[in-house]
Every structure is written in C-alpha cells, then in structure tokens.
C-alpha cells in the first residue's frame, strides 16, 4: 500500500531515469510479486465469475511490468509506491469495465446511504448498525454486503488521486524525481488533515484494515467511518488541487 509517512530528506538524482530504460522483467516480477498478491488479497471480495482472483493476479502482474517499463529504474527506492498505484488501478479499471457491481448491488448501496442519511437527520446523530439494519428491514449479513458495495467505489480513490495529480503535472510522463514531487505534495496535504482523518486513511490504505476493524480502532460505527473516509478524500483532493 501507499506509504503515507513523509520522507525526511530528499536528494534529486544527478541523472533522471527515462521510461524507456531497459529493465530486468524477471527480476522485477520476482521482487514484487508478493506486493501484487497483497493488492489482490485486499480486493478479493470483489472477485466475480467474470474476474476471478486468478484473473486479478494476472492483471496485476501485467500492470507491474508496465509500471516498470514506464518508470525505468526499478531499483529506485520510490518505485514500489508507484507500482502499487498502477497495479491497484489496473485491477480496479478491469473490475469497473466488467461492471463488477451489478445494478441491483448499486441500488442496494444507494439505499443504504439514503437510509443512513435519513436516520442521521431524524436522530441527530450517526445511527448504530442495529438501527440501520432495522430500518432496512434486512439481516446483518446483507447489511455488511451493502456496506462493502457502498465502499467499493471508493477503494481506488487515494491511488487515483495521486495518479491524476501526476498526470496533470507531468502529462503522464514519470521518473523518480517527478513521482517523488507528487509524493511530497501528498504528504504535505495529508499533514494538513485532522489527526483522526490521517489515522483513518493510514489504517485503510497503509495497514489495509477493513471497515469494521477501523470502526473498532476509532470507536465509531462503520457508517460513520464511511462518511469520514469520503470527507477526508474530498478535503485531500481540494488540498492537492490548490
């Protein structure tokens, strides 16, 4: 996952690597295949008959090789963070292309958001899980499935934010120094978020905790975590764009 801890020092290399620099693809795959498996494992809940875990693994490995070719110097210390963005992005793009969230699933996710919002207004606070389940007229398992569906569309948000910022600054061309510039901008923006939002994003993207694990750590309900996650990403996007 993205390492969201700011770098203490940074020295620009004397020579900037170009994306066309030949790479040892076998060494690249051997060195980072565990990272690909870790990304696939985090996204495994979205595997379908149209895109299995094995398919996701293959997509991730191809994206890893493409990331190496584009970046140039796979020995650069900043390459792993760049590669994670590309691997996650490639898998999520394919999942979206295959319409991995069915119309019914999307409708259920919207219904969950609507019910949560209405209960929050009527109660004057965030509703508990049991209150939402009762309002939906469903069971606990369906409720958790709906939460996963609601959160699924945001899984790539932080990675996509970083990629979009890079594209807008450098026209889609990457090297170690340029990618580090974006990483430093992201670190600076993260540092301007509240301590709670920083912790939430760190737990989600760096430590790969799921929604309910983060809720336990922060002593909040899963719906509140979803809300805070969305707000934090919106604020982060504004800070990165300013």
From Swiss-Prot:
Disulfide bonds: none
Entries under PROSITE patterns matching the protein: SIGMA70_2 (PS00716)
UniProt-recorded name of the protein: RNA polymerase sigma factor for flagellar operon
UniProt induction comment: Under conditions in which the polar flagellum is not functional.
A GO molecular function held by the record: sigma factor activity
Chain location of the short sequence motif Polymerase core binding per the record: 55-68
Protein origin, superkingdom: Bacteria
Keywords: DNA-binding, Sigma factor, Transcription, Transcription regulation
DNA-binding span(s): 211-230
Functional note: Sigma factors are initiation factors that promote the attachment of RNA polymerase to specific initiation sites and are then released. This alternative sigma factor is specific for the flagellin gene (fliC) expression.
Gene Ontology biological process: DNA-templated transcription initiation
Homology family: Belongs to the sigma-70 factor family.
